[in-house]
Amino acid sequence: MEDKEKQPKVDYGFTSCLYRMEIIREKKIRFLKITYGEDTFFCFSYLLEAQTAVTTDFPVYWYRRNLSSTTYRYHDNYLQETKEYYSSYYNLFHEKALKYIDFVEAGLNVQYYRRCISAIERELFFSPEDRTTKQRIETIGEIRADHKFQQYFTFKNLKFTPKGKFRVFLKLVKINCYRLAVIALDRLTKK
């Protein structure tokens, strides 16, 4: 992903892990109280406390995505959770593994951008019917104005989003024409 200020060094992800309960209890490791991303935070928290870790190529977890999963559900506080997600990770590594902070921050910035893109998608396509056009426009405007999001919100990075009307819409957000696009989308979906 392109960053206007600096290039990220890594993008990361976890699948599944087995944990020792005594480490969880002793170190008081907890999940974040958010709906999306709480599992990776738990995993990082655990790994920073563990003395050893074993990896395998064997698939022990199958992540199922469908339209009823949390991945696609609308959450009215998704943007706030994204900010909490970012600051929690940053604080964790700042406190427990400062020598990795630049490495982690680069990956977190990419993840923050992707979650903001997801927040726009949720606002457009998964918001409840009682959510007004004005509310949707305000939320998308708040995301667009976010400084950290703007660092990565480039036309070059838009090519990493799925082709189709969502990418077209993101281009309209980029050139600040999203208000009319939300109104048009509302009219199309209400027919």
Residue ranges and their predicted role:
Residues 1-56, 61-79:
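Donor-binding/catalytic cores of nucleotide-activated saccharide
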Residues 125-191:
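Membrane-interface aromatic/basic loop that binds lipid-linked glycans or pyrophosphate carriers
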Residues 8-9, 97, 101-102, 176:
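Glycine-centered secondary-structure boundary/capping sites
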Residues 51-54, 101, 151:
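Secondary-structure boundary/capping signal
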Residues 101-110:
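All-alpha amphipathic helical-bundle segments outside canonical DNA-binding/catalytic cores
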Residues 30-43, 86-91, 170-179:
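Short charge-dense sequence patches
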Residues 58-67, 73-100, 115-149:
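Catalytic core of nucleotide-sugar-dependent glycosyltransferases
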